[in-house]
Regions:
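Alpha-helix N-cap/helix-initiation sites
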Residues: 207-211, 277
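Alpha-helical transmembrane bundle of multi-pass membrane proteins
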Residues: 1-196, 222-449
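Short, well-structured alpha-helical segments
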Residues: 210-219
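TPR/TPR-like (Sel1-like) alpha-helical repeat modules
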Residues: 194, 202-208
């Protein structure tokens, strides 16, 4: 593998920074937007949820866009669009204007979270494909940490406009790098551009047998037309579709973005006070989560996907049980243990779900369906995200912290059994081998059973 091949994957993965920043920056900005615009609880939930609704729209359109104009061009356009929408949100003078800007921002993010994992999966050398997809989660976490830190540093001035507007900076920085990157050989072959495909492979892995790789890809694409959603809900890909839809929904409905979006409120409910506790501590938690991703990053291609994923889910279950006890106690004497519960949840999520969900999104479908498959998975994920963003504060008022984390804990147990039963181990497998797994009814062709 060459530095050029690594650069292609890492540049695309760096788009995760802008996604991560938006996830966490709203946590701090929401506190001050609520003061300036005198928002009710429901309106605060709407400010958070509007970007998720936009993401659903973007996710539904992303597969078609990526197949039509390519993975690279899609990534360049969405990055530029994100910068513009971030500035519009920062300049909002009313709640409707802010909601509209957040909606458009969400569309750009929705396209990004579909196209970027596909771009990385199709660009990266096989030996490090899993690690580079995990690196995408690393960049999301870097963005999340930056969002909390910016919110903390600007909290005293209540400068929510700066918190939102700063999001445009990483997008502008990334654009020149993205413009220089090639598209993927698989997309070029989908469009019949053989010479472009050959050049793309040579730039990524100049020492590899390019002609052999082109032949393998061409064989996989032979007699394949444009991917259609209708094909995904029929055999042999129905099983893969159901798997990624359920997995995507469980990733969010188990509560990760409740902690990211509303961490200041959660910490306050546990008894924490002050800007550092409400915005600085979440940044420290995410820093620990980043460490967990690095461990996963260097382990995924050696240990495999399943052991890491299942271990992370177990940590989340233990964390939910801990938080349920802390909130049920409600004496304010368990602050350290409560912080530990949040910390363990974030570490477990980022070690397992957060690191590997994008691996399955990029690996579960053949080339013609890969963008559509990622769109379907993200749409499912965002549906769970929208439910969390739109109703968490209301749930907290109705059920209390103990009730909310009891619900999250039960859903995480369900997630464990789903992954244990249905998630394939794809370590060391070529993308076309993984396609045969799903075509064979969820069994590897060499299995005797």
């Amino acid at each position: 593998m060459t530095g050029r091949g690594l650069l292609v994957g890492l540049t695309a993965a760096s788009v995760g920074v802008i996604y991560g920043y938006d996830l966490s920056s709203i946590a701090g900005a929401r506190l001050f937007i609520a003061e300036d615009f005198h928002l009710t609880t429901r309106q605060q939930e709407l400010v958070t949820t509007m970007v998720v609704i936009g993401q659903i729209v973007g996710a539904l359109a992303a597969g078609v866009i990526a197949n039509a104009i390519g993975r690279k061009r899609s990534t360049v356009l969405l990055t530029a669009g994100y910068a513009v929408c971030a500035i519009l949100g920062a300049c909002a003078v009313s709640l409707p204007m802010l909601l509209a800007a957040r909606l458009l921002l969400g569309v750009a993010i929705g396209i990004a979270v579909v196209v970027v994992p596909v771009y990385v999966a199709e660009s990266a050398p096989t030996a490090v494909r899993g690690s580079l997809l995990t690196a995408y989660q690393v960049t999301i976490l870097v963005g999340i940490i930056l969002g909390y830190l910016v919110g903390y540093l600007l909290a005293g001035a209540h400068a929510w406009r700066w918190i939102l507007g700063i999001a445009a900076i990483p997008a502008v920085v990334l654009l020149p790098l993205l413009i220089r990157m090639p598209d993927t050989a698989r997309w070029y072959l989908l469009k019949g551009r053989v010479e472009d495909a050959r050049r793309a492979l040579s730039r990524v892995e100049p020492d590899a047998d390019v002609e052999s790789q082109l032949t393998e890809i061409a064989v996989a694409l032979k007699d394949e037309g444009s991917g259609k959603v209708s094909e995904m809900i029929r055999r042999p890909y129905l099983r893969a579709t159901v798997f990624v839809v359920v997995l995507g929904f469980l990733v969010q409905i188990t509560g990760i973005n409740a902690i990211i979006y509303y961490s200041p409120t959660i910490f306050a409910e546990m008894g924490f006070h002050g800007d550092f506790a409400l915005l600085g501590l979440p940044a420290l938690v995410q820093l620990a989560g980043l460490s967990a991703v690095f461990v996963s990053l260097f382990s995924v291609d050696r240990l495999g996907r399943r052991p890491i994923l299942l271990s992370g889910i177990v940590m989340m279950i233990v964390a939910d049980a801990t938080l349920m006890v802390i909130f049920a106690n409600s004496s304010g004497s368990g602050l350290v243990l409560g912080f530990g519960g949040i910390l363990l949840f974030i570490v477990g999520f980022n070690f397992g779900f957060g690191s590997l969900v994008w691996v399955y999104a990029g690996e579960s479908f053949p080339s013609r369906l890969r963008s559509l498959g990622s769109s379907v998975m993200l749409t499912s994920t965002l549906t769970g995200n929208a439910l969390i963003a739109g109703f968490f504060l209301t749930m907290l008022q109705l059920l209390g912290g103990a009730g909310v984390f009891a619900v999250f804990g039960g859903l995480t147990v369900v997630a464990f059994f789903v992954v244990y039963r249905y998630a394939p181990e794809t370590k060391g497998r070529e993308l076309e081998e993984i396609r045969l797994f799903w075509e064979n009814g969820g069994r590897w062709p060499t299995d005797s059973s």
